[in-house]
Amino acid sequence: MCIRDRVRTYHLQLLDATPFTGGDLKIGDKMTFAPMIQKSDDYEQVESYIAKPYFLQQVMNGKHRWWAFTKVINRNDQAYKEISHIAWNIFIPGAEFDDRLIENEFVQKVLNDKISSSREMRNAQELTLVYQSN
């Protein structure tokens, strides 16, 4: 038996997302969420203008189902205070992402450095859909 000693509640605002592809969710489908800690004032723009195009490319190439970026706008007292945003992903099992968004190695490194310096990513967690109702 599992007994929860605390519940962490976050109210989220959707800031950006790719199109949702692959049809409706079904029992057994998996999604990940990665809590983020904002480290720069332009972090939200970094996700929308650098990360989103990369994930959109993967979606368009049939290698990813969905990516979304949310902001924590409210939380309860038990919730982690440092988490500012959450990134969401639905991967396609067995699909391998393209290595780069940009073919130019220098430009790709600059983009990767900008992403890394703008936020700290906490351990991603996996969710599995276990129930659906009509």
Which residues are covered by each model-predicted region?
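Glycine-rich beta-strand-turn "strand-cap" elements at beta-sheet edges
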Residues: 4-26, 64-83, 102-134
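A mature extracytoplasmic/lumenal domain signature
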Residues: 13, 47, 71, 89-93
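A short, structured loop/turn motif at beta-sheet edges
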Residues: 18-19, 38, 59-61, 92-96
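Active-site-flanking beta-strand signature of metal-NTP-handling nucleotidyl enzymes
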Residues: 26-36, 86-88
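Short amphipathic alpha-helical segments
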Residues: 40-66
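Short amphipathic alpha-helices within nucleic acid-binding modules
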Residues: 41-45, 91-104
